[in-house]
């Protein structure tokens, strides 16, 4: 009997396996669990906010009807284990949802259990960007993902032109995943994290000090702090003691700092001094009447400051209330059952079999995700990836006892000085921020980078060349001098910080080393930079960063030249023979055309044949000087003459200019006219050993490698050019203009032929993304502006008078191809004028001599007779033809009248 009574008690106390407890569709009370640390920075505001939200929900007649919403709050007391166990206790009771946990680390664990039990977990403080809905379908983040906060920081870094940052974070999932997201966003902006400085989750002051000392020794001065509320302020205190809150530093804190300022304001004076000039972010909540009313109400609820977490906590409760209401409207029931898998395992001492599955969990989850309402924080609506719509942040600058808003960040438009509601009424004009007061009370934008003060000297690779010691020279005692070295030293001396370096020769001094290989060694860390005659070409820019060019030097061709002496026939030199022939023929042709057009009615073009020939020749060649005395009377003749005089003007001007140059400028001649000549012939071509010129000639100009001859020094240039192709030398040498000018300074028998056919420059090479390249570029520009660059150039590269003579090459003779367009226009005009004139003559011939034309046709049917009659008409003077025609008509009239009388 006792055992029977005991079994009854157990049966009443514990529901049988598989038994389901069903509550009515509209229960009197719906329970929601909430776990957080009451005394934490976030906890002391969200408790007040959720109590206010529950009160407002239960007082509202438009939601839940007769059902009362109840939130059961459990204090985790800063204990990670309790943060996990408390939600599990809620899952043993009839709780439809849980708000929390507070930290991302514990939220990840609880979300696994919630997925099995189909109980939604809502958190506005667990912002770990790696918690995806695919892995945790029942985890819902009701604030903004940290992914957007890191995107905002990346935009700030790019806005100020910085390239590298240091990231300080807690060594847990929240810190590591947040910094990983920051690295991804920075890489999209072509920036990067140069140093990831991790601290233990609960660091000591000694831990912080050791880490900040390492940060101070790094090059980047842009420091992003993704910290915890617990040790974030302590970090700034240590940084100030180490002098790291001074001018030149940039500190960017995630929204943990703005939360502290909003919640605990006013902060102690010492704390405020520690964070002066820091930039921090805060979740943006648009202004509204609802928000203003809540802010006024908040001061009556608590003395604690209002942070954005309180606003999101309030909206989260309302979001759940609306979702519960929609859940009931869909016919949902609050019912729980045991998980068969857990039941099979057995509860044991852990009582796991007490965990219950929310039967309507999936439907309730859909109701939550479909909520679309306007709350204190703005629009509460989820996207397809379960992030809230319209992510935005305020960008704050800590100044004085508080902060000032220097701008906003929006996911769709980036940085702006206007909030979203004002941007809708204005045109977007790029990313902007207001001015910032930086650490050290500086308003100048920090450079963001300093030379690393780690005591190591930079290894600067300098090519040890066998040629042109004026450019770079390595002495026997190891001293390195030259134009390039002096420019580099002068630029380094202009930097606002010390850069210790040592020059290291690259090459054996006998064979010219490859500058491309020197640049490659910079990428591998053998050298920290490259200084010398390093030409900036595409291949090298893919491996390293280059400074502003300090020498403009393209490729040119140098070849043997001979001086052209004076000649009695120098006046024929401006035109090629073909040009002279065509010009002379054009004079004769135009004269003949003018004679044809003017002969019939212009007495100046009539007379004996001998006179007409002389007149035609005289008229043709007198147009060369615009001194022709014969006038043209026909319109066609005038048109042809105007066009011809324009052609003569162009030819005459070109001839005069070319002849002037020939007679006044020292002339040199060479069979090589430029790079085009070298491409068409098969002569050997010299190039500097170890230079990029070889690859350029082969790959860009398609010159066969067998034609290329490497030359090491100016002496080898000289010998190869003097020997020529016939004696084992070269027809020409292709090299950069800077070298050729040095080569020609004392060799007048050679000269530059043709035009410079590439545009390149020399620059200093640095590793990719090296801020030193930017600073040295600015220093090079400063050298150019203050005249120091020219003084260094004059010291090493000053050319002698002979180099100017060597650069003077024969003026190209004017060819027909330069004027063929003019001759074509003139020729077309002549042909058209003759065609029109012929048509007019045929028409006049038919009108003035119809009887003669018909009679001649009847009498003489041969074509030659008809042509002879027409030519006679054309040759006849126009007045004589008209008079003859008039007499013939009179005779015809008289004859006609006599015949009528006889009749």
UniProtKB/Swiss-Prot annotation:
Region of interest: Disordered: 881-903
Keyword Signal found: yes
Segments of skewed composition (Basic and acidic residues): 881-892
Disulphides: none
Coiled coil regions, renumbered to chain: none
Chaperone keyword on record: no
Localization annotation: Membrane
GO biological process: calcium ion transport; calcium-mediated signaling; cell-cell signaling; cellular response to amino acid stimulus; induced systemic resistance, jasmonic acid mediated signaling pathway; response to wounding
Keywords: Glycoprotein, Ion channel, Ion transport, Ligand-gated ion channel, Membrane, Receptor, Signal, Transmembrane, Transmembrane helix, Transport
GO molecular function: calcium channel activity; glutamate receptor activity; ligand-gated monoatomic ion channel activity
Transmembrane segments: 577-597, 607-627, 639-659, 822-842
Similarity-based family: Belongs to the glutamate-gated ion channel (TC 1.A.10.1) family.
Description of how the protein assembles with itself and partners: May form heteromers.
Protein name, entry field: Glutamate receptor 3.6
Source species of the chain: Arabidopsis thaliana (Mouse-ear cress)
